[in-house]
Amino acid sequence: MSRTSLIKLIHVARRELQLDDDTYRAFLMQKTGKISCRELTVTQLEQVLGAMKERGFKKQNKYPRRRFKGHVTPREKVYKIWQQMAEDGFITDGGDVALDKYVQRLTAKRNGGQGVSTLAWCHGDTLLTVLETLKQWHIRCIREAFSRHGLPLPVSPSGRELRGYDAMTAAYAHARKTRRMAQ
């Protein structure tokens, strides 16, 4: 690590360890015999940083490592939502045949009576329509479940009612996990 980077990191550590100027300079004097980072060699700077780490400083990455979630296709999302709805008890059959029948009924309305026979054949706008319609149905089921159990609909920290799919499903999962809602 370069000398400048070490000095910057030592100053970050000083802030995190909440060392006032006198304590910081006494600490440097004790470890190196000098009272300023400017006077220290790279080896001495590394020793000071090591001593600060022993006192509890933890270097944090500038860019925290994020877990790769991968790309999830809309078709995979439809399957997952369908399975989740079955697991939640909103639909009785979470299988592929039942999903294909749902897709056929839904797409028949758009195609003048002739629906797409299976989800695997849906592409583009048709697939997105199936996905968004299924999400809205799931949200309606969740709202009904909250109402049925006498629970208030979830709200954001600002007090506004949650409407987004991810927020609603997370609130429902939390309510089930905390046993506020029967499984």
Swiss-Prot record:
Induction: This protein is constitively expressed from the Pgem promoter unlike most other early proteins which are expressed under the control of the Pe promoter. Its expression seems to escape repression by repressor protein c and thus occurs throughout latency. It comes from the Viruses. Keywords: Early protein, Host cytoplasm, Host-virus interaction, Modulation of host cell cycle by virus. Coiled coil: none annotated. It is found in: Host cytoplasm. One of its GO terms (cellular component) is host cell cytoplasm. One of its GO terms (biological process) is symbiont-mediated perturbation of host cell cycle progression. Early protein responsible for decreasing host DNA gyrase activity. Promotes DNA relaxation of bacterial host genome. Modulates the expression of various host genes probably controlled by supercoiling of their promoters. Host genes affected include DNA replication and cell division determinants. Homodimer. Belongs to the mulikevirus gemA protein family. This is GemA protein.
